[in-house]
Structure formats: C-alpha cells, structure tokens
C-alpha cells in the first residue's frame, strides 16, 4: 500500500489503529497543531529540543496541507486519531478535525521513530510491539525539556527491548537518521530517566521484555504534548500517541550518511 492509499484508508475510516509497521519505506510524522499566536515560541521550542522534536515541516496559518509531506494530504482527516487539549487537559479524542479547524491553526510535523523501524527490521532486528500487535511503549521521564517561552514540559521516550548486539547495531543504524530522533538517548537503566515501572507506560502499551534483553530508549515525538499541556493553551491538538501521519517522504532520503 502506498502512503497515499494508506491516508485514503484513514480518511474514509477504514483504518484507526497504531501506524507502526505500515508503509515501511516511508516516514511517519507526529503532529502538533496550535494557534498562530503561540507558533513562534513553539518553533523555538522545537529548535531548542531537536532530539525529541525534529521538524519535518511547518504549515502556514490556517493551512491543513504541507506539500512537502504529500500532495494529496489533509492534516484534518489523515491521522487515525487526534488528541484535543484545552487549558492543558486532554478533553477528547477525535477521528477528524474538520469540525474543530480554525483559520489560525499552525501545523508542526515532527519526525517519528516508526520511520527507522523499517531499517531495523531489514537488518533482522525484531520489534516487540510489532510482533505483539501493540502500540510502542512511551514513558514520561524526569528530564526537563529546554524551555522556550511558555513551552517546557518533560522529555518523553519510546522503548524497544533488544539484545546487546542488536542494541549496538540499532545505535549504528538510527544515528544516520537525526530527522526521526536518531540514536537512542539511553540503554539499560530506566530509573536513571525517572522511569520506575516499564510495565506501566504513560502512553502506548507495555511489551514483553525477555531475559537477556535491554530496554533501549529513544527521544519521542510525544514530547511536544507534554509541552502543550504545560503551556495550558486554550486549545491545542496532536496525534494520539502511536497514531501517526503517513508521509510521502522516503526514509532513505532522511539519512545523513
């Protein structure tokens, strides 16, 4: 299935699940959508936190298309599920933004680690959340983001359990893709990140960690949602964690070496 066909299936309501493992050679994007009055500070926030918030594209005020991501793409309808935040609280999850769209909304598309999973799989590195049919586990850490204006919050990480040799290979592979979070930020000791229980992720689903495996943590594009909650904007919208925007950007084009 091409990215365009995948987006069409989302748009007509045929697909509503997590997007990991779909359209493998193509990049997926996290979303943050907020009023134009706050967009400059949020842009500075992304620039100050590039590991968690690598920008793939930024829309014009009111625009629900970013041509660089896909010609037939509609931000309002092409994500399986959206989180709506009001005054810093998650108030609802919706399957379309058509009724909520505002002329001053600015869209930020942020790189997603699902994008490099195809590269890991090609190297024979198993991905437990894909194997188990679950959403990737994501955890809010005790690490504060670099603040920019009203935006702060805490770093969120995704976790994939890997054997030592696979973890080393994963570092080598993912370091080539800083536009989709790059290399892991930590391996092996979740308490050093302020994570007490790997079986209780704040976002996504817990996965099986087998004997001899290490938890490998990548900076995650859900991080901006902690910043949106911290800022307590009157309204802000993001993808539901694990439910991404499929783009026409090839993963190979994002490699820096």
Swiss-Prot record:
Gene Ontology molecular-function annotations: lyase activity
Question: What Pfam families does UniProt report for this protein, alphabetically?
Answer: D-Glu_cyclase
* Entry keyword set: Lyase
Enzyme Commission number: 4.2.1.-
State the NCBIfam families in the record.
Answer: PRK05463.1
User: What family does the database annotate?
Assistant: Belongs to the D-glutamate cyclase family.
* Protein name stated in the entry: Putative hydro-lyase BceJ2315_40370
Organism name: Burkholderia cenocepacia (strain ATCC BAA-245 / DSM 16553 / LMG 16656 / NCTC 13227 / J2315 / CF5610) (Burkholderia cepacia (strain J2315))
């Amino acid at each position: 299935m091409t990215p365009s066909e995948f987006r069409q299936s989302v748009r007509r309501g045929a697909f509503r699940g997590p997007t990991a493992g779909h359209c493998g050679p193509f990049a997926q994007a996290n979303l943050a959508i907020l009023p134009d009055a706050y967009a400059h500070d949020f842009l500075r926030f992304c620039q100050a936190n590039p590991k968690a918030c690598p920008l793939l594209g930024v829309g014009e005020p009111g625009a629900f298309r970013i041509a660089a991501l896909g010609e037939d793409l509609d931000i309002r309808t092409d994500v399986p599920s959206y989180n709506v935040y009001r005054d810093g609280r998650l108030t609802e999850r919706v399957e379309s933004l058509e009724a909520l769209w505002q002329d001053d909304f600015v869209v930020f598309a942020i790189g997603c680690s699902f994008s490099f999973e195809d590269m890991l799989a090609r190297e024979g590195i198993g991905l437990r959340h894909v194997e188990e049919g679950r959403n990737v586990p994501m955890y809010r850490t005790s690490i504060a983001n670099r603040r920019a204006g009203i935006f702060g919050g805490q770093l969120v990480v995704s976790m994939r359990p890997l054997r030592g040799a696979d973890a080393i290979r994963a570092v080598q592979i993912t370091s080539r893709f800083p536009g989709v979070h790059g290399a892991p930020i930590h391996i092996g000791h979740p308490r050093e990140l302020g994570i007490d229980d790997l079986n209780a992720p704040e976002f996504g689903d817990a996965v099986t960690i087998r004997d001899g495996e290490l938890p490998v943590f990548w900076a995650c594009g859900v991080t901006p949602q902690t910043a949106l909650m911290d800022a307590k904007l009157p309204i802000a919208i993001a993808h539901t964690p694990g439910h991404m925007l499929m783009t026409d950007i090839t993963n190979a084009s994002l490699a820096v070496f």
